[in-house]
Amino acid sequence: MVGGTRSARVVGRSALSPRVTELTLAIEGDEPFRWLAGQHVTLRPDLPSGAPAAFSIAAAPSQTGLRRLALALSNGSALLAHTEVGSLVGLEGPFGAFTWQPAPSALLVGAGTGLAPLRAIVHDALGSDEATPVVLVAGNRSERDLLWHAELATLASEHLRFRYEPVVSQPDATWRGRRGYVQEHLEEITAGLAPGFRAYLCGSHGMVNACRELLGKLGVTEERIGYEAAA
């Protein structure tokens, strides 16, 4: 069902980082909720004044089945004030074409909660029969702020065709990984990708535009770049 309105119940809330909360929603009713990794939904609190807001689904259908969704919300989101465990929200969607496309290899670049749809795409790609190499570049302020950091590092250790490259802009003295902003590392990272790779970008407008500009200078055409940007 695309664009239909469903009800979903909040069945889980957990801290992904000091700034982000993960919500788990259980779809009400008998009909399965079908989506593609990378798509998003619009949520509306079950209140007369509840303003709708769009959120990317942070899980692939193969992870949660067709009855549950996982979303990542910044702690400043007004929606969090009305989504205690047990509460109902209206749900519309799924929407969007920010989904997996066949290519010799894939570059995924996300910052902040922009990592949510990319996490879904990673799980979907690794769970398929394809052998496409996938590189995920994930940016945030500090190691504590990196979303699903341990999970993604574990996936990289378990799948030879998946590489995880976390980048921290405000590292402490113990950080041994990449420093700065994601776009500052793309030239080096893309040098190891197969020609004709496809890029997926998700984050702030500034990050997405900087990555698009750099990839263009590296010869990546707009047709090979999928992106979603938020303010």
Question: Language model features by range: what are they?
Answer:
Residues 2-87, 140-142, 167-170:
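Ferredoxin-reductase
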